[in-house]
Amino acid sequence: MFRGVLLSIFGLVCLVGFSICLFVSDNLLMFWLFLELASLSLIPFFFLDSESGVLVSLFSYVVVSGVSSSLVVSGLMFDDLLTLLVIGLLLKFGLFPFMGWVYVVLIYSNWLVVWGVSTILKSSFLFFGFFLSGGWDSVLVEVCGGLTFIFIGFFFWLYTYGWVYYWSHAMISSSASLVVMSVELSPDLLLYVFMFYLFWASMVVMLLSRLDGSRVPRLGYIFLLIFLLISFPGSLSIFYKLFVGLCIYSCSLIVFLGWVFCSISEQFYLIKYLVGVGVPRTEWGVGITF
């Protein structure tokens, strides 16, 4: 356990350091190198958990990192293969149709891995727009983003068996939002969006890690849950949703409608959970349990 903590601290330092280096890289090759080093820096986080499922999670993460890396470098080397770069980045961010690996990695790992995948590793989206030449590449990103929102909107009700499942849905939805916005918005505005997301996501992951495994949350945790996740006047969630919603609306109306559907589905699910706290889980419906 002590060795795992030391490895995780080392991985955290490398993860933050290489992510910062993305912003000072002066060519595409160095950008790709720092991006992959940041991804590999997450591997020590897996060793905090000794459960057998961690090996499946780690294997899936390494395979996806390798495949996406190959696609990205192929797109960077050959202009005619730019679509492969876009596909590689979509795979790395877990957008439709590449959402499955995100669930395998997050569900069978620990909350430190969940935090790393959900926050720091998302910083590379700020450079997504620089690789797009417009036309079909931008359309592909918007289509995949819109379909991601629609599928996640249903997944909240069909595939949520705990808080880590819920956050996997929410994180993929946020990834789709960030990637879609990177196509149209200015780098300055994207940086503000990411800083807001980084703070909000870190707070949510910290809270959900405390709630995980608790059948009936404490009253204080419920208030924090409402403040961070339920969109009502004065909550942090409503500011985040409005900010992101306005940004997505300025990008594409169709994608915005998909995001609205996903957000409404998420809010109704959370409200149903809060109303059902203390009610026997068999009364919630089939397949929905915490």
Regions found by a protein language model. Give the residues of each.
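Core, highly hydrophobic multi-pass alpha-helical transmembrane subunits of bioenergetic inner membranes
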Residues: 1-290
